[in-house]
Amino acid sequence: MGRRFARMKTPAEPAPQSAPQRGEMAWMDGSFLPRQSLFLPVGDAGFVLGATVTEQLRTFRGRLFMANAHQERLHESLQIVGIDSGRPLTEVFDAAAELASRNHAIGPAGDDLGLVIFVTPGDQPSQQRGMGGTPRMVIHTFPLAFRLWAHAYEHGVPLRSVSVRQVPDACWPVQAKVRSRLHYFLADREAHAAESGARAVVCHLDGRVSETSTANIAIVRDGTILAPPPADALAGVSLRCAESLAESLGLAWATRSLTEQDLADADEILLTSTPNCILPATRFNGRGIGTGRPGRIYQSLLAAWSRLAGLDIAAQARAQSESTDESV
């Protein structure tokens, strides 16, 4: 009697995704191309091993913000990981600026973009008949997801302690900005299970606070802003911007390792990251921080950041979030 096989089920329709805008471009290995033509082989070490160095920027009115600082950090990450991109980073960032300008011009009025540069080692020899490849470099843009954080400028975000820990320096230095982020994924899943919308505070094995999955952390205590040293967290471009703005405002800034108890006792908690610049964390493990509302120093830094960017950062996020909601 012949062997019987189960009838194969027709795969479900994939969930709808945001399609590239007409005319939207990307850049790969020195050439501009339509975004829908962008691809990487599944045998690339960036997928097979998660060996991907990355940098994320954002635009204000279509122009890249703090591009030089991001270029410096990408250079440092490539050196740490040992990937030679094969081309000058000045050329890469010139292409990034052009790509951002072109894609911003075809987007909705008042919108802005995120821009990602990533570099992989190229083909993984074990999946290419033992033949390695040359590094691949890609630049692409996407509309900033303002609806994810527009409310937080006014109401803040909750933070949660989690059991997941930062990757030890013995594995790779915290200063390498890479895509190997499974610990962030697991940390945020644990935080979300404890409190809807909460972000995880990721600590080192010895208890030092490092960062969240998407932001650097600083606190305010007795009028002084305290931020972790470079050994504890990725050198955030936005954190450096906040420090510069604090200096211009005459605000005290100091660097030292932080603990979760420091967060619990803080007058304010500040979160800095490229897409949203600066946000307040108003709860930690279910308890209010300070007054439970965004604090004075946060408000001062946000206002200074808006002046530097040339637009009201929070107002833009609210307006674009409302526009997105209406189009859904």
Q: Which role fits each region the language model picked out?
A:
Residues 1-201, 205-208, 234, 243-328:
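Conserved alpha/beta cores of soluble small-molecule-handling proteins
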Residues 238-239:
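Secondary-structure junction motif
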Residues 200-201, 208-230, 235:
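Glycine- and Gly-Pro-enriched alpha-helical subdomains that act as flexible
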